[in-house]
Amino acid sequence: AEETSFVFSKFKPLEPNLILQGDALVTVAGVLQLTNVDSNGVPEPSSLGRATYSAPINIWDSATGLVASFATSFRFTIYAPNIATIADGLAFFLAPVASAPDSGGGFLGLFDSAVGDTTYQTVAVEFDTYENTVFTDPPYTHIGFDVNSISSIKTVKWSLANGEAAKVLITYNSAVKLLVASLVYPSSKTSFILADIVDLSSVLPEWVRVGFSAATGASKGYIETHDVFSWSFASKLAG
């Protein structure tokens, strides 16, 4: 399809248009819970979950040279019982159709090595809560663009509002290869924005899966929740 669009105003258990991997599930309240919590709602360590849209997305077309522009928006919350020990983060990603959850923890389920590799064919916008020095993370919670590597090509400081709902808008303008991500906390009226040039057609396969991936830390205390409340996406191949 040259155009794809979908809207989840809330999620439903056994949602046919979602592929859930790892620990991801939809709660009876209609929340996409990417990582495990115990019976008291406390997040658990060493949890990894992903959720992608059921249909592949046509991001570019080799026959015509057309590349898709897209816009996606979602609302999510990260809650950590102890803000001093939080890990590891959530990402929106585009990856090959056969992509499976990779290493958890700081790799966020998207990569399995600190070394970048073009065979990943993956682009992600990470909302990273833990400084993995081996990935050259900055020493604060941050938003980053990941292109075939967990080591971001560009980051911006993000002040995590613990337990507050964040509204994210990610857009890609294929005409100028501009990727933009913004995060707003309506409750505190704070906002963060990151933009860079990324040539998706040189990184991604023609057809991709789009969705979310999240992971908690391996150590007992390095935990947080990763809950997505709503998600919309629209893409269109354009010259």
Swiss-Prot record:
InterPro entries: ConA-like_dom_sf, L-lectin, Lectin_LegA_CS, Lectin_legB_Mn/Ca_BS, Legume_lectin_dom, Leguminous_Lectin. One of its GO terms (molecular function) is carbohydrate binding. Pfam families: Lectin_legB. Mn(2+) binds at E126, D128, D137, H142. Keywords: Antimicrobial, Calcium, Fungicide, Lectin, Manganese, Metal-binding. One of its GO terms (cellular component) is protein-containing complex. GO terms for biological process: defense response to fungus; killing of cells of another organism. D-glucose binds at D88, G106, G217, A218. Gene3D superfamilies: 2.60.120.200. Ca(2+) binds at D128, N132, D137. CDD domains: lectin_legume_LecRK_Arcelin_ConA. It comes from the Eukaryota. Galactose-binding lectin. Agglutinates human erythrocytes, and requires Ca(2+) and Mn(2+) ions for full agglutinating activity. Has antifungal activity against Fusarium sp., A.niger and A.flavus. Belongs to the leguminous lectin family. Tetramer consisting of heterodimers of alpha and beta chains. PANTHER family: CONCANAVALIN A-LIKE LECTIN FAMILY PROTEIN (PTHR32401), LECTIN (PTHR32401:SF45). This is Seed lectin beta chain.
